[in-house]
């Protein structure tokens, strides 16, 4: 598939300005906005938009997250909130998904009318179901979700998953995709032990404090999972 005229996906910050959505792959949207491509080829232009100095962002890092994405896409493929996969190009490390024009981030941060009750329960149901399936999905943000034509919320960015009973990731992989402004998030997990980080701590802090949908954090979901 020729991607030369596809557009990079950019999320909106709190002020409505465009910025990079994540530090892992190149997100591309077809001209008709009906296909979303997750391009895990290395290197790619998108991941050097903010800076050309990313020595920890390596092909090994990109490979690891591509494989993790595919693993959890497959695990959750039958869920109503799973993305509709068109194709996975393993040779070129590209994943093609059916797209509906905007992510939840663009709806919320562009000032569109979207009553909280229309997403509040859906994101809760998604996160609780993932937890009940034994998975922590760190990518809980609005730009990691979208609404299809039936007002059903779907989730992307499955690269950010770990097992609840084995929530450990080598530090080099996390350092490879963390933005300098979010370095404190890794520090909250504590020092790496044998070069491995406990991602459960990061998930809990994200869910309880850091992830925002508009001005609403996810603490109401945190309390239901952890009873804290």
Set out the residue ranges of the language-model regions.
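Active-site beta-strand termini and strand-to-loop segments that position acidic
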Residues: 27-33, 98-99, 148-149
